[in-house]
Amino acid sequence: MPSISTDFDVRPYEDVPAQTIALSVPDAAAPKHCPIQLLFWPVDGKSSFTRGYENLKEGLSRLLSDVPVLAGKLERGWKGDSRYLAVNISSDASVEFVYEDVSAEDIIPSYDNLAQNGFPTTGFRDILSPKMSLGPMVEGSPMMCAKLNMIKGGAILAYGFSHVLADGWANSELGRLWALHAAQVSQGIEFKKHKDATPDEDIRRRLSTLPEYDTDVPLDAFLQITPSEEATNFLHKDVLSAEKAKKKAREKMMATLLAAGEVPELPRFTFWRFTPEKLKELKQAAAGSDPDKWISTMDALAGLFWSRIALIQGQSSNGHQQSRCIFALDIRRRLQPPVPLGYIGNVFSPVDALCPLDELESDSLGLKAAAQSMRQANKGWAQSRWEAWLNKIMSLPLDQTLDTSQEFRLQKHNMYFNDYSAFQLNTASWGAPFGQPTRTRCLRSGLSGGAAGVWVCPKLPDGSLEVWLTSTAALQKSLFEDTMFNHYAEFVCQHT
């Protein structure tokens, strides 16, 4: 049986010079967290697990040479200004990639048990996750973290890239590159770089240049000016100050929910599966017969959740007239001039779709109205809107920044929608002995009340989509009983 290395520090495959990389303003404005992906594989015996770990480890070493910024640590940039962050790469830079045998942990089911139950993650997030991901992101935090866990009959890879460095698209691209390098290690192929060559320094400088601003373009209504240190995207100096700020924000949120008559509870995560046939049927139902009202499958999927949740909650009876659905657009190809798809960074724009609640709550009109609202919001995006956001961030005093309005986040008639369907996590092979993951899961936190969140997972090999919803127990129960919703959706699993 091959032995497994106990040196968890992974260094770049080729020497990387010490350097400091200035990030862009959109990078600095990104959420300060490291979203963790879980990849599940069946594994036959410790020997296969050991071989898989060593392949992933050398694949990671190659990735660090391909994308050196991943080996760095986050720091304040120009004159300590929180709008300008940087990544410092030392001459001995490395990334920690831990493995752990957790097969004896009673709380963690066997691989077969997880597969039979839809791969829920209740109760063992802290055991599986890299330690770095369990605390707040602060000055000195690494740009990525990873851990491989051996369970009974399988393996679970938990890894994440700092959102400060990578938005959703870039996160997917980094995962694809790691998988490609690991696969080539398993095949005995010599190292070569696979990341597309991009003028990163020029792009970051462009994204940090104060744009010409059309003063007639208003800021999005879901944004608000916030004291910098109270914003959700503020980079704190240390864990203690970050935890204090988090506690203060949570207390404020709980007080707001209680004042609105809501009882805060532990958020629930429910996974639903949509087959290619049901997605096609859903799109046809949401589009109707008017050829001028074309919608995408994703518009229809968002419309289903948005309309059925609105109908169940019936918030128009409480005096609310409109609902907002916020989603993020990757604008690499929409900006003029475009940003190359291979660029690693944050190039997204938050967008909100608006729909009257009386239309959303209509059993016959809700799906079509919601889907059309999503389509119009997508089509209506303009570069001037993004430039207004960037201009405002760069023009505010140092002690102020832009953040998502807490009022929006805590209003239950609103919704978040996140589309990760184009990501290749479920279809990329990581080489022998692991191969293609059976399933992926993303570990995220949820609100104790307020707006529901919907996440579309990476497409499965058969074309199906899994979608997860953060919601209250009451909303979850109502969706189980909703005939129209269950006509399209198949329950997969749930966890807290």
Curated annotation (Swiss-Prot):
One of its GO terms (molecular function) is acyltransferase activity, transferring groups other than amino-acyl groups. Pathway: Secondary metabolite biosynthesis. Keywords: Acyltransferase, Transferase. InterPro entries: CAT-like_dom_sf, Plant_Fungal_Acyltransferase. Pfam families: Transferase. Acyltransferase; part of the gene cluster that mediates the biosynthesis of squalestatin S1 (SQS1, also known as zaragozic acid A), a heavily oxidized fungal polyketide that offers potent cholesterol lowering activity by targeting squalene synthase (SS). SQS1 is composed of a 2,8-dioxobicyclic[3.2.1]octane-3,4,5-tricarboxyclic acid core that is connected to two lipophilic polyketide arms. This is Acyltransferase clz6. The active site is at H163 (proton acceptor). Its EC number is 2.3.1.-. Monomer. Belongs to the plant acyltransferase family. It comes from Cochliobolus lunatus.
